[in-house]
C-alpha cells in the first residue's frame, strides 16, 4: 500500500483532459489554416505577397505549437507512469502507522 496513491488518478485525468484540449486546439488551427487558404484567392498584387508571408509565418508557428503540444502530452503521460513506478519501488520502505 502506497501513501502517495491519491495523486495517480489526478495525473491520469490531467493527461486525458490535456489530450482532449490539445486535440481541440489542433482542430482550431486546422480550421484557421483552411480559412486562410480560402481567403488567399481574394488577395492580389502586394496584398497577395503580404498575405503569403503572413500565412507562411502562421504555418511555421502552428507547426511549433503542435510540436509543443505533442511534447507536453507525452510528458504528462510519462509523469503518471514514472510516478507509479517510483512509488511502487519505494513502497517497501514505508513503515506502518
Swiss-Prot record:
GO cellular component: extracellular region; protein-containing complex
InterPro entries for this protein: ESAT-6-like_sf, T7SS_ESAT-6-like
Pfam families: WXG100
Domain of life of the source: Bacteria
Compartment list: Secreted
UniProt keyword terms in alphabetical order: Secreted
Subunit structure: Forms a tight complex with EsxR. Exists in heterodimeric and heterotetrameric forms.
Domains: entry comment: In the heterotetrameric form, EsxS adopts a long helical conformation that pairs with a second EsxS monomer in an antiparallel manner that allows the N- and C-termini of two EsxS subunits to interact with an EsxR subunit at each end of the EsxS dimer thus creating a molecule with four-helix bundles at its extremities.
Similarity section: Belongs to the WXG100 family. CFP-10 subfamily.
Protein name per Swiss-Prot or TrEMBL: ESAT-6-like protein EsxS
Amino acid at each position: 500500500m502506497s501513501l502517495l496513491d491519491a495523486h495517480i488518478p489526478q495525473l491520469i485525468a490531467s493527461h486525458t483532459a490535456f489530450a482532449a484540449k490539445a486535440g481541440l486546439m489542433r482542430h482550431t488551427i486546422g480550421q484557421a489554416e483552411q480559412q486562410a487558404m480560402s481567403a488567399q484567392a481574394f488577395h492580389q498584387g502586394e496584398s497577395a505577397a503580404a498575405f503569403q508571408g503572413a500565412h507562411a509565418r502562421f504555418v511555421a508557428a502552428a507547426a511549433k505549437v503542435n510540436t509543443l503540444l505533442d511534447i507536453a502530452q507525452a510528458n504528462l503521460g510519462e509523469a503518471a507512469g514514472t510516478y507509479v513506478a517510483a512509488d511502487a519501488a519505494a513502497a517497501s520502505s514505508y513503515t506502518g502507522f
